[in-house]
Amino acid sequence: MKVCVIGNGGREHALAWRLSISPSVTKVYAIPGSAVMSDCAELVGIDWQQSDHLISFLKENQVDLVVVGPEAPLVAGLADVLNKAGIPVFGPSKAAAQLEGSKVFAKDLMKKYNIPTAAYGVFHKVDEAKTFIAQTGAPIVVKADGLAAGKGVVVAMTVDEANAAVEDMLSGNRFGDAGSTVVIEEFMEGEEASLLAFVDGKTVVPMIASQDHKRIFDGDKGPNTGGMGTYAPAPVLTDALRDEALKTILEPMVAAMEKEGMPYVGCLYAGLMITDEGPKVVEFNARFGDPETQVVLPLLDSDLGQIMMACATGTLTADMVKWKDSSAACVILASKGYPETSSKGDVISGDIKQYDTTIVFHSGTRLVGENYVTNGGRVLGVVGLGKDLRTALDRAYGRIEHIDFEGMQYRTDIGAKAFK
């Protein structure tokens, strides 16, 4: 079958790469894709927002399945437009994508269906939010309601820090409309893990658990980012805890979505806190994580195209999804100044080719002449593969020694929690 991937980041590079080696897939298109994705997909210069052009292209080229990578097109309703045109889509409807598009929607739904998460309040006014903060005390978590590229969360260790975050968001300075409503949550103690799942509207098949590293600096210091590295499988989510998360979080949420008249199709991403009381939801995302995708997909031992088509057509079964008995680690190389600002146009030197045991996924690069240059933010995701996590990490960091660009920054402690 022919598959089209929407997006151009590291996650989409990983999706296109994995689909291109799936037995059921004969052709991969990427809209718009990135220069490096031409190695595994045909790039198509169409804007997904021009739905008439997009649908014409998909029909003329007899594309069987569309895989939507980023959250913005999903929250904007791209899946609805394509489904209406009779094109199968791996990705949720606009209504279902509210799980990520609105923190308030997600929290209210979890409360209604008794899905374990942190206690919370919802606020539109600064003074009311500050009163809640004063009553609750710190540490406390302040979240912008809408999409903020993974940066709309402040874990405030003091009341002053929480108050400043509320003022920043509700004034509209930080995230515009996305921050016009805030969710304030109790601080949950524990270790975080990401559990993604394939979903076809009813059936939920969990993927291998991974762990992201959100903070920019070693030791989980500095501001939040879109993610500075991941590894899988994550030992913090034992088989027993994974089953518990499936039974108490993922399956109930998918059942709730169906009951609410917005069945969920695609990848459901549960960001979890593993507390003393068991797994609780930190957040839901309506798509593959970035950079979780870069470690989860290399460990898949099944046909990704077949799985995604089954999700899109309501025919998913657990036996379609098998995993390799090995490990993967991804270290993000970010540009100078990230996440506050980010440098662009710096030449990337060294070896960024693909090998059997290391893969380099491009998050933010451009091809200028013969050279790849940085294009801001997270630049590359260097993935190491191995029989165990130590081997995978050694391969990823070993590979980084042969890559360089001006102001390159990365964490040296990805995966450290797995060895505690």
Where are these regions (language model features)?
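Short, charged, surface-exposed secondary-structure boundary motifs
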Residues: 38-41, 55, 98-104, 217-218
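Solvent-exposed alpha-helices and their adjacent loops that cap or buttress functional pockets
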Residues: 21, 36-38, 90, 112-114, ...
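Active-site nucleotide/adenylate-binding loops and adjacent lid/helix of ATP-dependent enzymes
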Residues: 4-5, 100-181, 211, 235-251
